[in-house]
Amino acid sequence: MMVQPDPSHDEAALRRTADLYAIGADRRDKALWRAVLDDDCVIEGPGFTCSGLEENLGSIDLLGQMFRATAHRVSGQIAETAGESAQGETFGTAEHLLRDRDEVLAWSLRYRDRWRLRDGRWRFTHREIVIDWEETRPAKPGE
């Protein structure tokens, strides 16, 4: 009897990459990003493209320079696997507490994602950020 792979394991692992990416961005934790980004990962969004692991890790420093805090939330994901690759979309929001005033820049966004299974772990090879809408609103930062 041949045992069929359980796709729910891949789905959970792919979702975990998105969750760890979001947590890594908010905590400015490069180790979390290193765990979920492949060496040749490309992340692109409005007005920027980062290529390779080191350049992407450097963008965490830029987040810290641009914003006092961020809150990335993953609300859903659709993905399909094909052997050792996968593609899909990850949906969520990203809130950015501006550095120069008490306002939040909020995005409703999607990532068009591609992954590779390497050494038993799914890692992003490409993330394209698509902003569906954005808003700026007042914020009252915590103490």
Q: Over which residues does each language-model region extend?
A:
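Short, surface-exposed coil-to-beta transition loops
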Residues: 72-74, 106-111
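Short, low-complexity N-terminal intrinsically disordered segments enriched in polar/charged residues
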Residues: 1-27, 31-35, 39
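A short, polar/proline- and glycine-enriched secondary-structure boundary/capping micro-motif
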Residues: 97-102, 134-141
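Short beta-strand edge/turn micro-motifs at domain boundaries
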Residues: 87, 108-138
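A solvent-exposed, acidic/Ser-Thr-rich amphipathic alpha-helical stretch
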Residues: 30-94
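Extended, non-catalytic scaffold segments that flank or surround catalytic motifs
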Residues: 63, 71, 97, 127-134
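Beta-strand elements of well-folded, non-transmembrane domains
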Residues: 94-98, 117
